[in-house]
C-alpha cells in the first residue's frame, strides 16, 4: 500500500501509485525528514511512501540508515514521523 503525508506528517493512503509518486516528486523536502553528514558518515531518515510492514495493521513508512563508518548499513524503520525523528537522534549517538 502506498501513502502520502498530510500537513501534520500523518500518513494518508494514496488512491494509486501515481498519486504517491506525484506527491513524492512534489514534496522532496518532506520526504527527507533529516539528513546529516558527520565526516565521511551520512545519516539519512526518510519517508518511504510504501508500507514495509509484514503482517501488521500499522504501516511502517519511515527509515533511518547510516552510510559509512563502523555502523555502515545500520537501518531502523518506524511507524510514525515522531518515532522517525527519535530514531534519527539515536542513530546520531551510535
Label for each model-derived stretch:
Residues 7, 69, 82:
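Short, ordered coil/turn segments that flank beta-strands lining enzyme active or ligand-binding pockets
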Residues 13-17, 44-46, 74-80:
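Short amphipathic beta-strand/extended segments with alternating polar/hydrophobic composition
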Residues 2, 72-75, 85:
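Replace the tail clause
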Residues 1-41:
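Negatively charged, low-complexity tracts enriched in Asp/Glu with abundant Ser/Thr
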Residues 78-94:
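A short, charged, amphipathic alpha-helix used as a generic interaction element across diverse proteins
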Residues 45-74, 90-91:
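Short aromatic-glycine-(Arg/Gly/Cys) micro-motifs in beta-strand/loop hairpins
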Amino acid at each position: 500500500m502506498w501513502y502520502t503525508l498530510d500537513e501534520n506528517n500523518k500518513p494518508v493512503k494514496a488512491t494509486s501509485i501515481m498519486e504517491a509518486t506525484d506527491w513524492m516528486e512534489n514534496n522532496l523536502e518532506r520526504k527527507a525528514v533529516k539528513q546529516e553528514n558527520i565526516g565521511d558518515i551520512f545519516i539519512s531518515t526518510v519517508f518511504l511512501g510504501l508500507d514495509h510492514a509484514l503482517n501488521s495493521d500499522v504501516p511502517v513508512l519511515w527509515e533511518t540508515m547510516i552510510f559509512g563508518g563502523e555502523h555502515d548499513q545500520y537501518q531502523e524503520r518506524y511507524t510514525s514521523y515522531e518515532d522517525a525523528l527519535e530514531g534519527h537522534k539515536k542513530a546520531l549517538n551510535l
